[in-house]
């Protein structure tokens, strides 16, 4: 939660019970899946027709929330971090939340973690898929982005106004990670 425009959270006991919502109860479609040895498990958002991977814990701190999921083959940690450090006003004013995924194998298995960030705004979207080369000490990484073609930051007002400007980025420096903007389905 940053401000009334950029404010989503899980309104259920388990992260996979339903989609996250804005404070006004407007659904924000954000989905997370982990494929373990060919079986798809839901861990974030409405599980739809998928099995779920058991949520075994949640840890809330001042700047982050970490959910732990586990089955017989893996332990998955999903960490949402909003760097709201009060001694850095520039950082506090940045409407940005980071989502980190960490998987620990309990036994030998293949896995893929995937997220779908789906726009529900009635607007023309633009996006791209790209690779940033290695630069100095920073490693190379793949990324994708999505945002409205026409943006009016803070151009709306009212009780049920969600953020409708800026860009969503998905990035990973992990070898083999795929970050994709899907224009046809308006999702990352």
Named regions from a protein language model:
Residues 1-188:
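Accessory carbohydrate-recognition regions in carbohydrate-active enzymes
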């Amino acid at each position: 939660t940053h401000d009334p425009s950029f404010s989503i959270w899980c309104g259920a006991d388990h992260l996979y019970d339903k989609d996250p919502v804005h404070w006004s109860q407007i659904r924000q479609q954000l989905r997370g899946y982990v494929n373990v040895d060919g079986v798809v498990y839901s861990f974030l958002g409405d599980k739809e027709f998928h099995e779920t991977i058991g949520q075994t814990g949640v840890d809330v701190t001042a700047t982050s929330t970490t959910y732990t999921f586990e089955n017989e083959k893996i332990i998955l940690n999903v960490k949402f971090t909003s760097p709201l450090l009060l001694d850095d006003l520039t950082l506090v004013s940045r409407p940005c939340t980071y989502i980190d995924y960490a998987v620990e194998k309990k036994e030998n298995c293949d896995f893929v973690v995937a997220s779908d960030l789906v726009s529900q705004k009635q607007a023309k979207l633009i996006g791209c898929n790209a690779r940033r080369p290695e630069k100095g000490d920073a490693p190379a990484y793949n990324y994708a982005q999505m945002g409205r073609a026409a943006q009016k930051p803070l151009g709306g007002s009212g009780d049920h106004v969600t953020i409708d400007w800026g860009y969503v980025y998905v990035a990973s420096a992990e070898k083999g990670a795929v970050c994709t903007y899907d224009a046809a389905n308006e999702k990352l």
